[in-house]
Amino acid sequence: MLCIRRSLSRFVDSCPRPRYDTGCTYCEIPKFPADKQIDFDRNLNGTQPETWKHLLILSHGYPSMEAMPPRIELTPATLSSEINAVKRQMLSPMHPVAVSNVVVNNHTLPNKPLGPQEHFVYLYPDRKSIRFEAKDLATFIARYLVPEEKPEVYNPFKQEVEKTQRIQQSSIEFEEQDITDELVLICGHGSRDVRCGVMGPLLQREFDQVLTQENMSSHVKTGQITHVGGHAYAGNVVYFPRKGESVWYGRVFPEDVQGIVDTTIKQGVIIRDKYRGYVNGA
């Protein structure tokens, strides 16, 4: 199992206080039901799911996160359900792949409109946007979501079969582009859990306000993401920088947004008491 750990030298202990009020920086957070309270007790370090790659689906067909079903991976005819059906056979348990559906503001669109049987995804840490036809899903998985196997004991028959498969796969062209924007995604999957349904829109609005104020909105995009684990730590924020691994934060509130922008997005420094990843020595 892959485990990405970060050096303590790249951390600050806590989130800096905001420097100004956008109008909702100090907005009161609505009260949650008794059985849906935010967990303020657990140390967030190590609560991030370990992933080798993170696939973000943009072509899910839902206009907003509010319209997203609670378990889209079980919804027929969605890319999530198609991957879910074959993941045990095709994906490596030692190289886990997270699959999420996202609604992103002002993201880079394909050069031409998607057809009814086409998919459009972002893939990290590859930082690629990829467009492909539904019929080529198996090849897409083999090419992008499975690690290259190490050489095995010589077997002429097996090598010939694998050679044929490689030729077949290599003949399929995927429309692929580099992702140049940075991306901030907030879990807003309200049909799955009310905490994220409340916190997601609040946080996205605050990020949009702060990024505009800081003249960063042209290259840092925001959006909402389906369940990423840890609803009890809402608001959950995942930041995908231009370089390096993604940064996962929990228990983020509107008053924390300026600190995240100033500290993590501008300086590349991680806020330890919000960080859901793994820390050396922690």
Swiss-Prot record:
Gene3D superfamilies on file: Glutaredoxin
Pfam name, any one: Suc_Fer-like
Domain of life: Eukaryota
Family matches, as CDD domains: TRX_Fd_Sucrase
Disulfide bonds: none
Family statement: Belongs to the AIM32 family.
Name assigned to this protein: Altered inheritance of mitochondria protein 32
Organism for this UniProt entry: Meyerozyma guilliermondii (strain ATCC 6260 / CBS 566 / DSM 6381 / JCM 1539 / NBRC 10279 / NRRL Y-324) (Yeast)
Name of encoding gene: AIM32
